Amino acid sequence: MAEGEYPKTAEKMAPAEMMDQAKSQEDRAERMPRGREEAGESRSTLMPRTPGLLLTLDDILVLPRYELVTQFKCIEGWSEIVHWAGIRMADFIAAYPPASIDGADPKYVYMETPDGDYYTGYDLHVCRHPQTLLVTEMMGAPLTQFHGAPLRLHMPTKYGYKQIKRIGLIAYTNSKPDDYWTKLGYDWYAGL
């Protein structure tokens, strides 16, 4: 390869991938609720019903606080013992239940960052696992921006790439949601 020349994959794949990502974001924008943006406000709230209820972080923090020490595992092979604190996702779902679809609970939960650039999906029953947390603290201190402040997900049954940081939207759905890393070839379930 000559100096200044890009590898064939970078030359041909990056623009196509960028176009696919932009198209995917447009598609999601048409079918996913956009929180307070629709009302001309910030998208820093959560929306557990599709469409519907807007929640602030304070609405979530009234739920019981729970602490958990688990091993955080990265798919790259490293791991770390972490002390987490936050709200059980099961408590959140019980307090702000999904609207029924055809008389039954939706099957999936979709989450994305406030800017919509990162998004992931989960089975609803996995989100109800007693150790799945909406985290507000890590290692005895409030979450930092680097670790996903003000709210991130922790699932000790999943690899780290499924543990979304900076949650800006939560929606329930009966359709298996898009997932950022799955589109790049990673497993949708990411189970340990």
Language-model region placement:
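Structured, non-membrane catalytic/scaffold regions adjacent to prosthetic-group chemistry
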Residues: A2-L192
